[in-house]
Amino acid sequence: NEAEDGAWRVISGDRCIYIKHEGESCFDVSCDSTEFESYWHRYLDLDTSYRMIRGKVDRNRDPFLYESCMDEQGIRILRQNPFETLISFIISQNRNIPIIRRSIELLSSEAGTELVDTRGVTYYSFPEPWQIAAMSGEALGRCRLGYREPYVRRTAEGVLDGSIDLAKMTCADKSASDVSEAGTIKGLCQIYGVGPKVANCMSLFGLHHLDAFPIDVWVKRILAGKYPDGYPIESYRPYNGVYQQYMFAHYRKLSKGQA
């Protein structure tokens, strides 16, 4: 959420930070250097060279992707909490962004922990699996999840009892993971209420598999309009998910006449 002074408030789990753009490559953050280096540095994925990733795109061979990369240089794939991301994408199915945001806010206020940020503003942590599993039917109903309600509860229960092991799926520490992308998607689709689209979104944004390539209505339009002969997915491994985000953001701007 954007604050009155132009700073952005970012909540991750039980943490909250304000980030304000102060100039080219200069940002002001509302935490000390110890907290930033121990948590937010990794969360913002600052050790990944997105300049290197953009540099792999040839301007002449793929002008649209090159243009997208140049126009959307600020995009990063955050290293978000896997459980929080999975629940959020389960909630997102067949909904628009304002309704998704409201349901997540309601879930957090119903089951999360009430906290206060550095500016004295109250916020709620995203609930842990045990907090969601312990919710009454009435409390969960107040979150306006609709048919997704049992998906959310059963996912929380699965993480609690170990039948859903997100740690085994993550590639956040690639040196300790040999999980293939295809295997991850298959495993995610075995979770109650998770289909291919949610699985691909979860793989990219929750497990940091940078080659995952979620396809929604906007990406379908991009592929049909800009790549009628087929998108060269093999040429862009292992960063297809990053390129998808560049194209998605740039194409949305073009469609609104903002680029």
Predicted segments — roles?
Residues 1-259:
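HhH-family (HhH-GPD) DNA N-glycosylase catalytic core used in base-excision repair
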